[in-house]
């Protein structure tokens, strides 16, 4: 990753006007994507994600604002200049859009027709199929491929013009979880091997968690939160972001299950049911042991989860802290000093 911006959207607005009403699909959005980013844009259906990213290559012209891509003011380009610039921006979709009557090699070669010699095209197609792991499928037809393999063909075709940016518009939405994971791993590999900047549109925070380094959350046409992946996951500011993250981490189900446990139903007057979120160095500390040895507070762990985000440990615990009221409060103060984020679950439930 670098600090060089390759996509800069400023105050981008998109409105659709019908006979009876208007729709504000994108509402004055600012977005900066740096070279080498895998930038996830997540939101529910209808949030405006796809409309927003289609302004990057002007498949959707904005009603207002500016679009700068790879140093070019996209809105100032002539049609011929725009066609040239679009070759620097690849795109893959949920639907594969393959030509069923043509072989896989011919599908990948299609964008190159008329631009290279036959021999050069064959060489390029072979390189692309090798890149996406489909060398042995060059002479197959789309009907003979699985959904994941078809998407790999789509990726190879999108890379035919050697783009610097790849837009993935819900490209894994129609795939099963295992295949989704393999496609995401391929995208991450392409990012690392080719220096490819990727903008990933999805309604699945799990996909963002797996490969993105930055994330923006969209709702009702606006970006309501954005930032470094670890920062957003560890300290979400908006309720929608929290909901996405908790669903991905399965914390909602965990809390529902915990609330039914006898330990929780029979809490003492000074007991506290808490969610502890910790990142990085905090994950390496013997926090539970320290609570008991220094504060005489017992921590009953009802749920625990730790994951690695951007090579950094990120964990959540649901615990009952038991002890004297003042000691429990002192223990909580100690946890906060260790940069542990604390959420009182019973207050949240209330």
Swiss-Prot record:
<dbReference type="InterPro" id="IPR018449">
    <property type="entry name" value="NIL_domain"/>
</dbReference>
<dbReference type="InterPro" id="IPR045865">
    <property type="entry name" value="ACT-like_dom_sf"/>
</dbReference>
<dbReference type="GO" id="GO:0033232">
    <property type="term" value="F:ABC-type D-methionine transporter activity"/>
</dbReference>
<keyword id="KW-0813">Transport</keyword>
<dbReference type="Pfam" id="PF00005">
    <property type="entry name" value="ABC_tran"/>
</dbReference>
<comment type="subunit">
    <text>The complex is composed of two ATP-binding proteins (MetN), two transmembrane proteins (MetI) and a solute-binding protein (MetQ).</text>
</comment>
<dbReference type="InterPro" id="IPR050086">
    <property type="entry name" value="MetN_ABC_transporter-like"/>
</dbReference>
<keyword id="KW-1278">Translocase</keyword>
<keyword id="KW-0067">ATP-binding</keyword>
<dbReference type="InterPro" id="IPR041701">
    <property type="entry name" value="MetN_ABC"/>
</dbReference>
<comment type="similarity">
    <text>Belongs to the ABC transporter superfamily. Methionine importer (TC 3.A.1.24) family.</text>
</comment>
<dbReference type="InterPro" id="IPR027417">
    <property type="entry name" value="P-loop_NTPase"/>
</dbReference>
<keyword id="KW-0547">Nucleotide-binding</keyword>
<keyword id="KW-1003">Cell membrane</keyword>
<dbReference type="InterPro" id="IPR003593">
    <property type="entry name" value="AAA+_ATPase"/>
</dbReference>
<dbReference type="InterPro" id="IPR003439">
    <property type="entry name" value="ABC_transporter-like_ATP-bd"/>
</dbReference>
<dbReference type="Pfam" id="PF09383">
    <property type="entry name" value="NIL"/>
</dbReference>
<feature type="binding site">
    <location>
        <begin position="43"/>
        <end position="50"/>
    </location>
    <ligand>
        <name>ATP</name>
    </ligand>
</feature>
<keyword id="KW-0029">Amino-acid transport</keyword>
<dbReference type="InterPro" id="IPR017871">
    <property type="entry name" value="ABC_transporter-like_CS"/>
</dbReference>
<dbReference type="GO" id="GO:0005886">
    <property type="term" value="C:plasma membrane"/>
</dbReference>
<keyword id="KW-0472">Membrane</keyword>
<protein>
    <recommendedName>
        <fullName>Methionine import ATP-binding protein MetN</fullName>
        <ecNumber>7.4.2.11</ecNumber>
    </recommendedName>
</protein>
<dbReference type="GO" id="GO:0005524">
    <property type="term" value="F:ATP binding"/>
</dbReference>
<dbReference type="GO" id="GO:0016887">
    <property type="term" value="F:ATP hydrolysis activity"/>
</dbReference>
<comment type="function">
    <text>Part of the ABC transporter complex MetNIQ involved in methionine import. Responsible for energy coupling to the transport system.</text>
</comment>
<feature type="domain" description="ABC transporter">
    <location>
        <begin position="9"/>
        <end position="245"/>
    </location>
</feature>
């Amino acid at each position: 990753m670098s600090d060089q911006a390759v996509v800069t959207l400023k105050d981008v607005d998109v409105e659709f006007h019908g006979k009876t009403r208007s729709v504000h699909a994108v509402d004055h959005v600012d977005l900066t994507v740096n070279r080498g980013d895998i930038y996830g844009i997540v939101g529910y259906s209808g949030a405006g994600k796809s409309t927003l990213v289609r302004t990057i290559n002007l498949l959707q012209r904005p009603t207002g604002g500016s679009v700068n891509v790879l140093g070019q003011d996209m809105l100032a380009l002539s049609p011929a200049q725009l066609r040239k610039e679009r070759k620097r921006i690849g795109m893959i979709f949920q639907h594969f859009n393959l030509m069923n009557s043509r072989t896989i090699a011919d599908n990948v070669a299609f964008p190159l027709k008329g631009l290279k010699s036959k021999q050069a095209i064959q060489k390029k197609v072979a390189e692309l199929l090798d890149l996406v792991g489909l060398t042995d499928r060059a002479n197959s037809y789309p009907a003979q491929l699985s959904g994941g393999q078809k998407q790999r063909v789509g990726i190879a075709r999108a890379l035919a013009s050697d783009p610097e940016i790849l837009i993935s518009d819900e490209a894994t939405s129609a795939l099963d979880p295992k295949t989704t994971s393999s496609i995401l791993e391929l995208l991450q590999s392409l990012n690392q091997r080719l220096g490819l900047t990727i903008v990933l549109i999805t309604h699945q925070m799990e996909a963002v968690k797996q490969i993105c380094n930055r994330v923006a959350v969209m709702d009702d046409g606006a970006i309501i939160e954005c930032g470094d992946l670890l920062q957003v996951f560890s300290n979400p500011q908006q309720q929608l972001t929290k909901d996405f993250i908790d669903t991905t981490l399965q914390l909602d189900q965990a809390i529902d299950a915990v609330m039914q446990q006898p330990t929780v139903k029979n809490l003492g007057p000074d007991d506290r049911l808490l969610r502890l979120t910790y990142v990085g160095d905090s994950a390496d500390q013997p926090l539970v042991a320290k609570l008991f040895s220094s504060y005489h507070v017992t921590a009953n762990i009802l749920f625990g989860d730790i994951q690695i985000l951007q090579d950094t440990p990120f964990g959540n615990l649901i615990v009952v802290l038991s002890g004297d009221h003042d000691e429990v409060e002192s223990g909580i103060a100690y946890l906060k000093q260790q940069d542990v984020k604390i959420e009182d679950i019973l207050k949240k439930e209330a």
